[in-house]
Amino acid sequence: SGSCEVKTCWWSQPDFRVIGDFLKDKYDSASEMVVEKHRESRGWVETLRPKYTFFKPPTERDLVYYESSPNFCEPNPETGSFGTRDRICNVTSHGIDGCDLLCCGRGHNTRTEKRKEKCHCIF
């Protein structure tokens, strides 16, 4: 009787958290660029150059941008953003629902409510 060996190779994705952390690091260290137009023999050419020359230039693996993100803290009908004013936030959270981040440093008002509701409890 003969023997048979099977060898299987595959690529697997890292955990979603690992990918998210990697992208967040890239986002946090992204380089702002400026679009420069110059004339060459084939016409006008646009190139990107770093806005700030005192930082090291980005590599091919770095994230770059040439337009700033809109300010989502304030209402902007052009982008459809309602802003964050009057939103409910979580005072104890340091995440995206936390008051420090959601209120964009404007501070927040704390409101305590007492409600009287019928609970339809059966004892």
UniProtKB/Swiss-Prot annotation:
UniProt keyword annotation of Lipoprotein present: yes
Subcellular location: Secreted, Extracellular space, Extracellular matrix; Secreted
GO MF, one example: cytokine activity
Residues carrying a glycan: 90
Residues with lipid group (O-palmitoleoyl serine): 1
SS bond partners: 89-104
Coiled-coil parts of chain: none
Source species, domain of life: Eukaryota
Gene Ontology CC terms: extracellular space
InterPro entries: Wnt, Wnt_C
DNA damage in keyword set: no
Protein modification: Disulfide bonds have critical and distinct roles in secretion and activity. Loss of each conserved cysteine results in high molecular weight oxidized Wnt oligomers, which are formed through inter-Wnt disulfide bonding. Palmitoleoylation is required for efficient binding to frizzled receptors. Depalmitoleoylation leads to Wnt signaling pathway inhibition.
Keywords from the named record: Developmental protein, Disulfide bond, Extracellular matrix, Glycoprotein, Lipoprotein, Secreted, Wnt signaling pathway
Broad class of where this protein is predominantly found: secreted
GO-annotated biological processes: canonical Wnt signaling pathway; cell fate commitment; neuron differentiation
Function according to Swiss-Prot or TrEMBL: Ligand for members of the frizzled family of seven transmembrane receptors. Functions in the canonical Wnt signaling pathway that results in activation of transcription factors of the TCF/LEF family. Required for normal embryonic mesoderm development and formation of caudal somites. Required for normal morphogenesis of the developing neural tube.
Family: Belongs to the Wnt family.
PANTHER family from the UniProt entry: PROTEIN WNT-3A, WNT RELATED
Protein name stated in the entry: Protein Wnt-3a
Source species of the chain: Plethodon jordani (Red-cheeked salamander)
Gene for this chain: WNT-3A
